[in-house]
Amino acid sequence: MNFQFLAIFSVRLATKEEVLDRTQESGDVNVVWVFTYNSNREFSVFEFILINFLFLLSIFVTFIGVFCIGKSNIPHRNARWIIISGMLLWLELVVSRSFVFIFQWSSDGLQSRSGLLFWAALLRYHYMFFGVHTLLCITAERAMATILLKDYETRPRVWIAAILIGANFLISLTYAFLAVFQQILMKSIFIVCLAVAVVSIILLEIIYFLNRKRLDSLIRHDNTMVLYTLSIKYQLQENVRSCRLMRPAVVVVGAFIIMLILAECLPIILDFSDEVQMWCNLIFDTTVHTDPLVVVPTVVALMESFRKVFLSYYRTLQHKIRPNTVAVIRRKSIFPFTKPKETEGDIYFEMFNKSVSPNSLAVKK
């Protein structure tokens, strides 16, 4: 196969000794070297079948989550678009893993195959940074809902979601290029992801506190406030409810992403045996590429509006597959009844004909 169009850029295939030497010299870890080392190993048929099965299951779960979020009315449309973008960008990992499989199966030259790993690493780290910054985008959207309090719900303002998603895509792509070109190492990546997750959680708490404080003040003094309107009260209630629902999801997703970053490099830094590293890499790689099995159920379960949509459609589907049938229980009668004969209907019909015959009418006259 010819992959020259992918070999514009390439990455160096590092060995375990090189990764450890670089770690001891600089006190930091080159994540791209770790990625190429893990990708340049032998893989089993079991691993191939397992990951592809989990990929199909993850795609199914992802589209269920997107459907539930799209059908929900809470939170605002812009927040739902941001969450959906974070879920759908997971498809980059499917492409990334496909490049790794082609690299492991291909018999082409080293240059063309290393080009495949470059694009695989770029897509992998772009998704990772995009997922982390999605937490900050959700917080920024709630901040805009707090600033534009008077008419945020009545106007779509799709440009807010478009700007946040576009900025997230470009910033994450910049970080991914820096990581692949070895301009930022493991410590820098970890600091960026941790800082973004912590800042998102803190800002979301501040936004929740401000909206909650203003809503309480509005409820206590609604008769005396001159600028009191029902739309402002509704928007404050919406902001408080959305922030309350998003807080646990942001914490869980942020902790999960940071855990994945650490799990990639720790087995090599701690110098585990090759067999242990192989199993650690299999578990980590499978978890990364099938994270919708963790993230999507977490978001749907922790956010009440998404959970209600899912349960509603689940009950509807269950009713269509297995409709509820009311069992009719007939008790045995205490009166003996004989079974009707086959000619019983004919006898009654003849009696009726005789009763309306012309002779019977003449007698009555």
Swiss-Prot record:
Whether Membrane counts among this entry's keywords is yes
One GO cellular component term, please give it: membrane
**UniProt-listed Pfam families:** Sre (PF03125)
Annotated keywords: Membrane, Transmembrane, Transmembrane helix
Give me the segments passing through the membrane.
49-69, 82-102, 116-136, 158-178, 189-209, 250-270, 292-314
Q: How does it sit in the membrane?
A: Multi-pass membrane protein
* GO BP, one annotated term: sensory perception of chemical stimulus
Location relative to the cell: Membrane
Tell me the PANTHER family matching this sequence. Answer: SERPENTINE RECEPTOR CLASS EPSILON-21, SERPENTINE RECEPTOR, CLASS E (EPSILON)-RELATED
The Swiss-Prot or TrEMBL record describes its family as follows:
Belongs to the nematode receptor-like protein sre family.
Task: Specify the protein name.
Answer: Serpentine receptor class epsilon-21
Q: Which organism is it from?
A: Caenorhabditis elegans
Give the encoding gene's name: sre-21
